């Protein structure tokens, strides 16, 4: 995860990770088998995420098929929502939906740069969104 320019997105991603950990702990404590995938598949998804961000297609590892990143992320959010509610972080998790809908800081920075090819404007955008 890259650094987010909006605090609420950072909190949302923290809530997502927290809920995922809760889910994994419960599976482990129940004696259920945890998923295991080849490193090559995990590395490919990391590369695709770094290269294409939310606009890419990741490999849905259990199904071994490519799906839009946003769609896969929404499925994960839906899957762990109950855990976030148990933890009291469901409101923060809503920010992940906002991030998926409106895009992340990197996407906004690209739009700003392509509009005027001025890195100062990109920095201005980051400062405005970070301090908002």
What positions do the PLM features span?
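C-terminal accessory/tail domains of diverse enzymes
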Residues: 1-132
